[in-house]
Amino acid sequence: QPNIRKPSEVMKLERMGSFHPSRLSFSRILIRKMIQQKTRISCSRWKMDKNGFGNAVYQLNLFGKNLALIAFSNHIETSQRTDRVIASAWDTSFALFDGVPSISDIERLKTQLPFQEAGRYKNTELVLSRANKSVRMFELVAQSLSEGKQPPSELINDIGYLMRTTAVYGNGKFGIDDRKNHSDLSDFSVPFQLEMLTVYLIRGFSLDLVNHIAKARNPKKFVPLDKKIQRYLGIGNATGLGMAPFLVKHPVLLNNWFQVRETALSRMIDLAELSKEKAERLIELTFRVKAFINSWNTDDDRQKKRIDILKAEWVSLINEFTLEKLLKINALKNIFNGSKNYSTECQELIVSLFLEVGGDL
């Protein structure tokens, strides 16, 4: 039985809200699978006008299964653009499709997807989603590229995405496919893999769309968005409205997720000796973490204070991550026990750091 932290310690809202992404996060699991499978994504259809309105299809094969993202980009009035759940129009709408879509599939979804919940769907649709542009960011990036220059780094750091999803629906919602009916989807049994794949593809679509619009404005001066900036940009998420009731209604599922995370942490803490390779990797990651948290921006005063405290704590904590100290007996256990003197944000960042080098465990 692993020596894991007590539920009374872990299952506190303050601590849960302080969790950081780790190698056990759903999106990270998906990316590892795609790398292992050497997945290639191709844009098989791009029917966009000069203003970026139209449709596109992205195809890929994962675990021997053909999948496609069908994307629609539509003009909407500024007054219609809202991230609230009561919205009835969005800049873009998407479906993750089971197989290779035909022209008739695309035409059918063209009349349904923009209506989202009000549309009618078949079991070939695995996931539905919609997204709005970050208008200020999207327009500034498009205009900069059309003038032959890269967008200002300050804006990229401040916002960090071109589009934000306002919903991602899967697993039987609104008449789409219920995955329990498909044994050939067993490789996607880890929670939210298809949803995360959809969001990953939407992110790629947003980059292609801004490049397309910029080039259409000024083909002679246009330069594509720098690859480093493309790698930095993510995808925004406007709401988390369904998260609270989902967690309340699925306690066993929540327990399983936490059990995996805490078990993995206990295996790392219980390592009597750390290999030199792992120690060097940890040292490298501590400096990457420092650069990462220094780039964080938020308008929330409470969270800003927490981040400021975390920044100061991390500068102090880095002194514990030397090769000499990490190669001592029970080094990780000593660091972890010592972290209890730091903020919850810092404690949970250390958890993610430890997990990062423990993939073989």
Model-predicted segments: where are they?
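Amphipathic, interaction-prone secondary-structure segments
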Residues: 29-90
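Charged, amphipathic alpha-helical stretches
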Residues: 1-49
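Mixed-charge, Lys/Arg-enriched low-complexity segments
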Residues: 1-13, 89-361
